[in-house]
Amino acid sequence: MAVALDSQIDAPLEVEGCLIMKVEKDPEWASEPILEGSDSSETFRKCFRQFCYEDVTGPHEAFSKLWELCCRWLKPEMRSKEQILELLVIEQFLTILPEKIQAWAQKQCPQSGEEAVALVVHLEKETGRLRQQVSSPVHREKHSPLGAAWEVADFQPEQVETQPRAVSREEPGSLHSGHQEQLNRKRERRPLPKNARPSPWVPALADEWNTLDQEVTTTRLPAGSQEPVKDVHVARGFSYRKSVHQIPAQRDLYRDFRKENVGNVVSLGSAVSTSNKITRLEQRKEPWTLGLHSSNKRSILRSNYVKEKSVHAIQVPARSAGKTWREQQQWGLEDEKIAGVHWSYEETKTFLAILKESRFYETLQACPRNSQVYGAVAEWLRECGFLRTPEQCRTKFKSLQKSYRKVRNGHMLEPCAFFEDMDALLNPAARAPSTDKPKEMIPVPRLKRIAISAKEHISLVEEEEAAEDSDDDEIGIEFIRKSEIHGAPVLFQNLSGVHWGYEETKTFLDILRETRFYEALQACHRKSKLYGAVAEQLRECGFLRTPEQCRTKFKSLQKSYRKVKNGHVLESCAFYKEMDALINSRASAPSPSTPEEVPSPSRQERGGIEVEPQEPTGWEPEETSQEAVIEDSCSERMSEEEIVQEPEFQGPPGLLQSPNDFEIGSSIKEDPTQIVYKDMEQHRALIEKSKRVVSQSTDPSKYRKRECISGRQWENLQGIRQGKPMSQPRDLGKAVVHQRPFVGKRPYRLLKYGESFGRSTRLMCRMTHHKENPYKCGVCGKCFGRSRSLIRHQRIHTGEKPFKCLDCGKSFNDSSNFGAHQRIHTGEKPYRCGECGKCFSQSSSLIIHQRTHTGEKPYQCGECGKSFTNSSHFSAHRRVHTGENPYKCVDCEKSFNNCTRFREHRRIHTGEKPYGCAQCGKRFSKSSVLTKHREVHVREKPLPHPPSLYCPENPHKGKTDEFRKTF
């Protein structure tokens, strides 16, 4: 607040029977000098803070000047460390105060922290006394006795009228006896005359309610008279619009005061019509403002609301019918600044208390990602004084769940601050036991309408997959309801997220081994009702799964089983025996409940066989083992699961053509001109050369004798396995589809692009690549064909890296990069070359390596015609022609066009030598120098030397893998 100026009350003058009071400044108080020492110290402090670099000639002089000013301000030769620290804290304390209060407090020059706090406390007490005095009703006819005369202090930023000591005598137990006496010891005290009867002054009601320097009318009554006399105008400087937002208590004080007296105030002899302002006051709104939209004002209002609630026991306001959470989204950027990202302790406790209400978690049970639920939670938070968006509420709850799981599983050392609250929310056993009452009301701080039913046994558990391949498409909050089946609590120890536990997978396979399930899967592997029944069986056993999750899990088990059986992976499948018993025993078993197939008209009458695009069953894989390896080793192509999820193609009849006709009983001729994928021909040759496990025989007579052909262990061709001729059109269609890898036929042709495909699913995949990309990035405008690709791309703009390595702390924005990074720590190298047996941790590295055996160099320079096997080498070569040097050293400003040379150059400045000799221990900054150094040991002792290790001195500056070079 501003400096309080005393009101020196001169001797009263009798003019025509009226008592005239004159208010003027106290010259002694204004002209009294400040204590020595404090003035000089404050002067040096201001000089130190306001010092400019332009005032001196150079940096040395600037530093010396600052040192001198700081020493003169803090005086380290006289003060101790604690005193200097106290001065710095006092300065910061005065800085964080509101602007006007800060100016008033700085003029007092407090010498200690207690004195600075006492100044602010004194101001708050004065404001509280002002509230109590003004809140008393104003009577026109009936006036208080002379002994109860009082004067209202105006806490203006520039001037504050202080009560005379006569009022203090009326308050023997005043709380201002401490610091108030120290401030008023220099003031002249003059008691009011006994014949004076002052009436309370009120600010004039101007049209804008914020007029500066208002003329305030004070009514004085003559001695023994009851009629008001002509007023005497006393000029008071009052800037209400500025001070009302700086001191919330004074704002509320004057709001209540004006509401009571707005009809009785007379300013300058004219009444003011204030019906609209009274209406706004009744609605708890300020009559002088239309809305508070600035961040500073909102934060002050919020703190004032919390303060009033704690001091005056104001109840939580009823739910307003005004702005809802949807309208919050239309607020400006300033509201987003208030919302922020950080959640305080009190805000989080309130948030968890709201979520404990039964209607919220019951609604989330039905729909985990219900935006309306989080919108209602955000509205409740807003009523409690916290502004949050629905998306922020959802993200916060997700983060709390993640921290709770880490602490519970022992993955995080530091404790979760809200572990007990989350445990009570997510664990039914942690809740209080139910009493005789059906619903027990548990009191929640700051919320009186939230009732928690202790009888509700619902656990909200969310498990995220570390790889997050689906990009939260199937990840959400899953609710587990306890089953009455014996042993269900043990099963509930497994988290019900995307991850499947061992016991849950065993139960899932046991359910699939039932006759009704595998026979239905035999007919159609994508039947949603079938997986829905499996999900129901899992739910009865205590595991909550969706039909889509069951289908995806079964597909994943099929893929793992196929890889292990064909020797494509080194590690064994945990459920290999169960899958082998499920597939092999059921494949040859008869199907008594299978409906008889209706024989269709012979296709010989039409002169040929027209192979229709039919969807493969669950017992017949969509891709061969060779194609599966291609998709595993090349991350740019669509995965097998993505192909399965493509809808069945339904296009015009003329879109698919079969150029070759096959007759039953006729021999199938081999076509030497095979139509292959133009963009995958070389990669297919590489993979087939390294992963081929069957012979490429084209003799149709040997086809029926082979039980495992091209790795297709999922085929359900009873006629082929038993050596019987296939008479049914369905079996014949499968035989034709199977013979295509041997005859090279690709009957499906896309007319628009002229490319042929061997399977209808491949055609649909190709059409997917050529269609319009519906998912567009709002930042850069890039389009994508799948939503998960857009989500993964948006992390580039937001900088989000949700995948964090627990070993080194490095974060990634993509699950594939995170998985490749984890192989560095585990040493896993699942990709093996079929020629030399060398293993790699990434599929892209295997593809690049295989080009050394085939001699393929797909990247050719258009300028000089030079070819490269690696895209990075090709990009570095192009910079030779363009002259681009993107890698610039910050120390010497030297530029490089190659990142490898740039890293070698950086080691000159850092002194890093990551390459060390295993024999003599010498270290080098370049691998080429280490190679030359090895020749010295070879000449001395011509024996095979041990490989030297790449051990960087600073693991954050160099590579982390081993460096080995052989001769």
Curated annotation (Swiss-Prot):
UniProt record, GO biological process: regulation of transcription by RNA polymerase II
Single GO MF annotation: RNA polymerase II cis-regulatory region sequence-specific DNA binding
UniProt key word DNA-binding: yes
Residues that bear Phosphoserine: 591, 600
Main localization category: nucleus
Compartments where found: Nucleus
SCAN box domain ranges (all copies): 45-127
Keywords: DNA-binding, Isopeptide bond, Metal-binding, Nucleus, Phosphoprotein, Repeat, Transcription, Transcription regulation, Ubl conjugation, Zinc, Zinc-finger
Disulfide pairings: none
CDD domains: KRAB_A-box (cd07765), SCAN (cd07936)
Biased composition (Basic and acidic residues): 167-185, 954-967
Keyword Transcription included in the entry's annotation: yes
Covalent link location (Glycyl lysine isopeptide (Lys-Gly) (interchain with G-Cter in SUMO2)): 22, 242, 259, 277, 337, 482, 529, 734, 745, 752
Zinc finger region(s), C2H2-type: 775-797, 803-825, 831-853, 859-881, 887-909, 915-937
Alphabetized SUPFAM superfamilies for the sequence: beta-beta-alpha zinc fingers, Cysteine proteinases, KRAB domain (Kruppel-associated box), Retrovirus capsid dimerization domain-like
Bias type Low complexity, positions: 586-602
Region spans: Disordered: 150-205, 586-626, 941-967
Domain KRAB: 229-300
Any single GO CC term annotated in Swiss-Prot or TrEMBL for this entry: nucleus
Family annotation (Gene3D superfamilies): 6.10.140.140, Classic Zinc Finger (3.30.160.60), DNA breaking-rejoining enzymes (1.10.4020.10), Homeodomain-like (1.10.10.60)
Described function: May be involved in transcriptional regulation.
PANTHER family named in the record: KRUEPPEL-LIKE TRANSCRIPTION FACTOR, SI:DKEY-210J14.3
Family in the record: Belongs to the krueppel C2H2-type zinc-finger protein family.
UniProt-recorded name of the protein: Zinc finger protein with KRAB and SCAN domains 2
Organismal lineage: Eukaryota, Metazoa, Chordata, Craniata, Vertebrata
